[in-house]
UniProtKB/Swiss-Prot annotation:
<dbReference type="Pfam" id="PF00505">
    <property type="entry name" value="HMG_box"/>
</dbReference>
<feature type="domain" description="SAND">
    <location>
        <begin position="1"/>
        <end position="31"/>
    </location>
</feature>
<dbReference type="GO" id="GO:0010596">
    <property type="term" value="P:negative regulation of endothelial cell migration"/>
</dbReference>
<feature type="DNA-binding region" description="HMG box 2">
    <location>
        <begin position="124"/>
        <end position="192"/>
    </location>
</feature>
<dbReference type="InterPro" id="IPR010919">
    <property type="entry name" value="SAND-like_dom_sf"/>
</dbReference>
<dbReference type="GO" id="GO:0005737">
    <property type="term" value="C:cytoplasm"/>
</dbReference>
<protein>
    <recommendedName>
        <fullName>Nuclear autoantigen Sp-100</fullName>
    </recommendedName>
</protein>
<keyword id="KW-0597">Phosphoprotein</keyword>
<feature type="short sequence motif" description="Nuclear localization signal">
    <location>
        <begin position="72"/>
        <end position="89"/>
    </location>
</feature>
<keyword id="KW-0963">Cytoplasm</keyword>
<dbReference type="GO" id="GO:1902044">
    <property type="term" value="P:regulation of Fas signaling pathway"/>
</dbReference>
<comment type="function">
    <text>Together with PML, this tumor suppressor is a major constituent of the PML bodies, a subnuclear organelle involved in a large number of physiological processes including cell growth, differentiation and apoptosis. Functions as a transcriptional coactivator of ETS1 and ETS2. Under certain conditions, it may also act as a corepressor of ETS1 preventing its binding to DNA. Through the regulation of ETS1 it may play a role in angiogenesis, controlling endothelial cell motility and invasion. Through interaction with the MRN complex it may be involved in the regulation of telomeres lengthening.</text>
</comment>
<dbReference type="GO" id="GO:1902041">
    <property type="term" value="P:regulation of extrinsic apoptotic signaling pathway via death domain receptors"/>
</dbReference>
<dbReference type="Pfam" id="PF09011">
    <property type="entry name" value="HMG_box_2"/>
</dbReference>
<keyword id="KW-0238">DNA-binding</keyword>
<dbReference type="InterPro" id="IPR009071">
    <property type="entry name" value="HMG_box_dom"/>
</dbReference>
<keyword id="KW-0677">Repeat</keyword>
C-alpha cells in the first residue's frame, strides 16, 4: 500500500520547452523515476517558451495551450529576445543541467533492469524460413531483369511470386527449411552444453569489436 500510495504522488511540472519531474510526498522528496532521470536536459533555447505559455494560461485559464503554435515561434523569439532575458533562460538551463549531473552521480539502476546479454559470435545462426529460401533463389533473377528496381519493389515482386506459387512447389522450400531448423536445434543445444563463454572469451570479442571500429 505504501509503494502504491507513493506512486500516486508523482507530480509532473510541465515546461513548454522541456519536462522537469518533481516528486513530493508528505514528509520527503523522492528521486525521479529511472525512465526520466536518464533523459538529457534540453538546450537553453527550449526554455524560452516557459513564460509565454504561463502567460497564456493566466490570460486564458479555460483554453488549452496550443503547443505547436508556440513551437513554431520559438526560433524567432530566441533571435529577437533581449540580451537580459536570454541570459535568464541560459541560467535556467545551466541550473537544470547542474541538477541533472548531481542526480546522475547518485543514480543507481533498479534491480529489475537487465543488462545486455552477451552474444556469442560463434553461436549458430537462426535458419531462414521457406519464404526467405525462395527469395534467395529468385532475387538475383528479378534484379537482373529489373536493375533499377528499389529494394521494396523487389520484395513486393518476390512476395507476389511466392503467393502465386503452387502449394506442391512450396513444399520443396518448406522441407528444406524444416531440415535447417532441426540442424539449428541440435547445433544450439551443443553450443549451450559447452556452457556460457568465460570472461577471457568476452575480452577477446570486445577487443576485436574495438579494433574493427578503429579501422
Amino acid at each position: 500500500e505504501g509503494d502504491r500510495g507513493a506512486s500516486k504522488n508523482w507530480k509532473l511540472s510541465i515546461r513548454c520547452g522541456g519536462y522537469t519531474l518533481k516528486v513530493l510526498t508528505e514528509n520527503k522528496f523522492l528521486p525521479e523515476p529511472p525512465s526520466t532521470r536518464k533523459k538529457r536536459i534540453l538546450e537553453s533555447h527550449n526554455n524560452t517558451l516557459v513564460d509565454p505559455c504561463e502567460e497564456h494560461k493566466k490570460k486564458n485559464p479555460d483554453a488549452s495551450v496550443k503547443f505547436s503554435e508556440f513551437l513554431k515561434k520559438r526560433s524567432e523569439m530566441w533571435k529577437t529576445i533581449f540580451a537580459k532575458e536570454k541570459g535568464k533562460f541560459e541560467d535556467m538551463a545551466k541550473a537544470d543541467k547542474a541538477h541533472y549531473e548531481r542526480e546522475m552521480k547518485t543514480y543507481i539502476p533498479p534491480k529489475g533492469e537487465k543488462k545486455k546479454k552477451f552474444k556469442d559470435p560463434n553461436a549458430p545462426k537462426r535458419p531462414p524460413l521457406a519464404f526467405f529460401l525462395f527469395c534467395s533463389e529468385y532475387r538475383p533473377k528479378i534484379k537482373g531483369e529489373h536493375p533499377g528496381l528499389s529494394i521494396d519493389d523487389v520484395v513486393k515482386k518476390l512476395a507476389g511470386m511466392w503467393n502465386n506459387t503452387a502449394a506442391s512447389d512450396k513444399q520443396f522450400y518448406e522441407k528444406k527449411a524444416a531440415k535447417l531448423k532441426e540442424k539449428y536445434k541440435k547445433d544450439i543445444a551443443a553450443c549451450r552444453a559447452k556452457g556460457k563463454p568465460n570472461s577471457a572469451t568476452k575480452r577477446v570479442v570486445k577487443a576485436e569489436k574495438s579494433k574493427k571500429k578503429k579501422e
